[in-house]
């Protein structure tokens, strides 16, 4: 096991220079440096993720509103939201986060581009949290799953015009007037496609379309699409 001194200050600088130049570097030292470098990066990502999480819990209007709505549903307006239910961790899959009814919210520290991406992701998962408490969602029921995905993508801000434009620009198929709805539908289909009870992307699209009108129109706990 490496001492913490090997991974800090001058000693880390020395090891980095040795790794980059290869001078006097044994295969074992090379492997150890790469392992230590990865561990340092993971720790840095984790600390940054929690820093952003805490900032959003304190200052983001959307996140704060959702936390208040969840708290009222959960134990009453006087109870405190348990932020330990929102954890940061490394994710091998290409996703920004996830929600589990028993475990809470996962923020994928290695997939989040910046503070504002984390805000969208956290808002998305908090909407799933709200839905699960309010309607006791059966996440293996495709219609339940699709409805919550539609709401989460629509209300979280991840499909607002500017975010969708940054992703797609003026590519074929991008329509300014219905960009928000196209984004919500696309992301909902992708999420439902990953459900173990979903047979194919076409199956997911069919389910999303079946529940679209009622679920897209349901903006609770907001009065309207806020972001």
UniProtKB/Swiss-Prot annotation:
Entry binding sites for a divalent metal cation: 124, 128
Domain of life: Eukaryota
Signal peptide extent: none
GO cellular component, one term: mitochondrial intermembrane space
EC nos: 3.4.24.-
Alphabetical UniProt keywords: Hydrolase, Membrane, Metal-binding, Metalloprotease, Mitochondrion, Mitochondrion inner membrane, Protease
Keyword Transmembrane: no
GO biological process: mitochondrial protein processing; mitochondrial proton-transporting ATP synthase complex assembly
Topology within the bilayer: Peripheral membrane protein
Outcome, altering residue 124 to A: Abolishes proteolytic processing of ATP6, but still promotes assembly of the ATP6 precursor into the ATPase CF(0) particle
Annotated active site: 125
Recorded GO MF terms: metal ion binding; metalloendopeptidase activity
UniProt similarity note: Belongs to the peptidase M76 family.
Subunit architecture: Interacts with ATP6.
Function comment: Has a dual role in the assembly of mitochondrial ATPase. Acts as a protease that removes the N-terminal 10 residues of mitochondrial ATPase CF(0) subunit 6 (ATP6) at the intermembrane space side. Also involved in the correct assembly of the membrane-embedded ATPase CF(0) particle, probably mediating association of ATP6 with the subunit 9 ring.
Full protein name: Mitochondrial inner membrane protease ATP23
């Amino acid at each position: 096991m490496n001492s913490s001194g090997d991974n800090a200050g001058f000693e880390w600088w020395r090891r980095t220079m040795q790794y980059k130049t290869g001078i006097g570097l044994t295969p074992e030292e090379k492997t150890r440096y790469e392992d230590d470098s990865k561990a340092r990066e993971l720790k840095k990502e984790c600390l940054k993720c929690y820093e952003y999480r805490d900032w959003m819990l304190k200052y983001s209007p959307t996140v704060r509103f959702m936390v208040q709505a969840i708290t009222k549903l959960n134990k009453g307006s006087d109870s405190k939201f348990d932020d330990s239910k929102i954890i940061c961790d490394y994710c091998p899959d290409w996703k920004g986060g996830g929600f589990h009814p028993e475990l809470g919210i996962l923020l994928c520290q290695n997939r989040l581009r910046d503070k504002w991406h984390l805000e969208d992701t956290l808002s998305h998962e908090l909407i799933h949290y709200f839905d699960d408490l309010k309607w006791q969602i059966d996440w293996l029921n495709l219609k339940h799953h699709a409805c919550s995905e539609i709401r989460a993508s629509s209300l979280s801000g991840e499909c607002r015009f500017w975010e969708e434009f940054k992703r797609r620009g003026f590519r074929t198929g991008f329509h300014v007037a219905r960009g928000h709805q196209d984004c919500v539908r696309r992301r909902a289909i992708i999420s439902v496609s990953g459900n173990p009870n979903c047979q194919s992307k076409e199956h997911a699209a069919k389910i999303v379309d079946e529940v679209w009108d009622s679920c897209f129109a349901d903006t609770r706990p907001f009065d309207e699409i806020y972001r």
